[in-house]
């Protein structure tokens, strides 16, 4: 992306306390910041699972939910999700629905990079053809949600930690969404 992205730094109450350049923010001492996580579904109710590009600084090559990112100053979370969906997987979305509005996590990847985010979780339906950005996504699969939830429970080490936690906290809402988008 040609525009330099920032993260919005927040305190424990979610109040904005500043901004920082995205790559400078993600270190072994990452400050709490705003993010979002989205689970995208097709009209068959299948979930898009993506494998993070090897060039990603945190969790490279790891399987995760569809699209994640950070809202920018002056941008709503919904606008940020639509922007990142276009950038990462080349799609337009509809029916953007909050699944876990208060989700928060802090995890350390194997290289020592910390993710420390207030990260509301959303589900949405893809309404245009998929065109993945290889700088973001090295592979992807469409999977039945029930199979994915079983895999997350059986082999959590094979997926991003935020995806595992999101599924554990919001599986019923994800199932409901998947059932409702089936054509």
Curated annotation (Swiss-Prot):
- What does UniProt list as catalytic? 68, 117
Any GO BP annotation? isoprenoid biosynthetic process
Q: Does the keyword Metal-binding apply?
A: yes
Instruction: Copy the pathway line from the protein's UniProt record.
Output: Isoprenoid biosynthesis; dimethylallyl diphosphate biosynthesis; dimethylallyl diphosphate from isopentenyl diphosphate: step 1/1
Q: What SUPFAM superfamilies does the database record attribute to this sequence?
A: Nudix (SSF55811)
The reaction(s) catalysed by this protein are: isopentenyl diphosphate = dimethylallyl diphosphate
**In the Enzyme Commission scheme, what number(s) does this protein have?**
5.3.3.2
Task: Provide the Gene Ontology terms for cellular component.
Answer: cytoplasm
Q: What enzyme category does the UniProt record give?
A: isomerase
Q: Where in the cell is it found?
A: Cytoplasm
Family statement: Belongs to the IPP isomerase type 1 family.
Q: What exactly does this protein do?
A: Catalyzes the 1,3-allylic rearrangement of the homoallylic substrate isopentenyl (IPP) to its highly electrophilic allylic isomer, dimethylallyl diphosphate (DMAPP).
What is this protein's name?
Isopentenyl-diphosphate Delta-isomerase
Lineage of the species this protein comes from: Bacteria, Pseudomonadati, Pseudomonadota, Gammaproteobacteria, Enterobacterales
